[in-house]
Each structure stands twice: as C-alpha cells, then as structure tokens.
C-alpha cells in the first residue's frame, strides 16, 4: 500500500484475502446480479451462443460467468482472473462442462494461451483494476476475432456532482461499513470507492475504446441507484 491506499498492483492479493466474503457482499447489492445478466445480453448471440467462444476477463468468483451462462448456455466460456482465492470460489461452484477457468493476468496472455481467439470478451468490473489502463483495451481487442464483441460493465461515473454524491453516500453509508463488518478490513472497499472516482467518465472510457481500435462503441447506464454510476459499453473489433 502507498500512503495507506491500496495500489492496483496489489488488488489480486487483496481479493484473495476477501474472497470468502465477496459473494455475500455483492449479493447484498440490489441489482448486482441482474445488472451483470443485463450487460451480458449486449452480446446478442443467437441460438444460445452455439458455436461461439466467450472470455470472461476478470471473472472473480464467477458471478459474471454465471451471467454469460444464462445468456449463452451453449457457448464455450473461459473465465480468467489473477486472484487465486477468487478463482477457487468460482471453481467450487457447479458449471456446465463448457466452462473452464484459468489463473493469470489477462493483459499478459495471448488469445492462443487462452484457447482463443474469442467471439466475445466480457470485462465486468475489470478495467479499473488493471495496472496498465491505457494498454488494457488494446490487449482485450487482441483476444477477439475480427468482428468480435467486447462488453465492458463497470463503474464509470457521469461528469457532474450528482453521481459522485450518490457514490460517496453508498460507499461510506453501506459498502465500506459492510466490508469492515464481514472481513474486519475495509481497505479493499475504500479502494473500490477511490478507484471509481479516479476512473474514466462514460465519455472518456468510450473514447479510450475507440483509440484502441474498437468501432461501433455504444454506452448504456444502469438503473436504480446505479444510474449515472455503472455503465455498460459494447464495442466491436474490426
């Protein structure tokens, strides 16, 4: 940590320590799982994803993987995460034989390393946490086949005070106290609060995707308390 603040390079280890409580925490977040399922539907795959290969980049304990399975039950799905503790939780859950998990940093691996190239890459709550944010979209594009689709689902606070005020209130009123109660350590949840404030606005992230070579970039905000705070981005690899 630097000055008491969790660094992005330390995030996988922090998730290892908090893996046991993670599912309980996100499960208490109204709309968390529904939001992931709604984001996954942006792939718009026909026939349950038959014949397609999907990568769940930053799969964590498998919540985003489950959203992909619900949307594309016939697709081949690979989940990758840098946290061994989170992956252990994911692997312990029941999955179809078409789902497998890999431990590693997604930006350090090639499409061939992961069994790609992929028809779609799902990056849910990932880009904020990668050490090399500027290089990350291009790294994800390299994992896609031509015409493949990237779906990003993440905190990207809309410019202006309203979204930030809601985010401050939710984090300091709910998320950080709950994290401290369940784990005895609120460091990861203070990092979550700060990382969203420091991350791109929706417009900036859309621009980052375009600069990485993606086309057809579209943005959609979540509903409820997450309106203007959580956004889904859909982009295509040329």
Protein language model features and the residues they cover:
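A short SAM/SAH-binding and catalytic strip from SAM-dependent methyltransferases
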Residues: 120-133
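C-terminal alpha-helical "lid/dimerization" subdomain adjacent to the S-adenosyl-L-methionine
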Residues: 26, 156-208
